[in-house]
Swiss-Prot record:
Subunit-structure text: Homodimer. Part of the ribosomal stalk of the 50S ribosomal subunit. Forms a multimeric L10(L12)X complex, where L10 forms an elongated spine to which 2 to 4 L12 dimers bind in a sequential fashion. Binds GTP-bound translation factors.
Pfam families, A to Z: Ribosomal_L12, Ribosomal_L12_N
Gene3D superfamilies associated with the record: 3.30.1390.10, Single helix bin
Protein name: Large ribosomal subunit protein bL12
Keyword Ribosomal protein attributed: yes
Family, per entry: Belongs to the bacterial ribosomal protein bL12 family.
GO MF annotations in UniProt: mRNA binding; structural constituent of ribosome
Length: 122
């Protein structure tokens, strides 16, 4: 079994996308959430179908013809490095940001559509 230092070293070498997948796997395996307590309370209320949705995932469905502009916009919006942003755009359809407030999600959608991307809020 790996010791704590080996695990930390392995995590240091991961990309942001790999870290995101790791967090999701840990959440599923142990039945926990990495969200802040306020966000977790909102997520618990999200199970009610009649409740208004307050958090949205922004999904890039297509980069369109201006792929370079879309990569730059994704890089700015996510804080990813250029390589990771390009991989995310190349892998479309992909969720760019999760659990965003409606207003922020709509702003990001508008920014990405301005540079030619196709985006959906889920």
């Amino acid at each position: 079994m790996a010791n704590q230092e080996q695990i930390i070293e392995a995590i240091k070498e991961m990309s942001v996308l790999e870290l995101n997948d790791l967090v999701k796997a840990i959440e599923e395996e142990f039945g926990v959430t990495a969200a802040a307590p306020v966000a977790a309370a909102g997520a618990a209320g999200g199970g009610d179908a009649a409740a208004e949705k307050t958090e949205f995932d922004v999904e890039l469905t297509s980069a369109g013809s201006s792929k370079i502009k879309v990569v730059k916009a994704v890089k700015e919006a996510t804080g990813l490095g250029l390589k990771d942003a390009k991989e995310l755009v190349d892998g479309a359809p992909k969720v760019i940001k999760e659990a965003m407030p409606k207003e922020d999600a709509e702003k990001l959608k508008e920014q990405l559509e301005e540079v030619g991307a196709s985006v959906e809020l889920k």
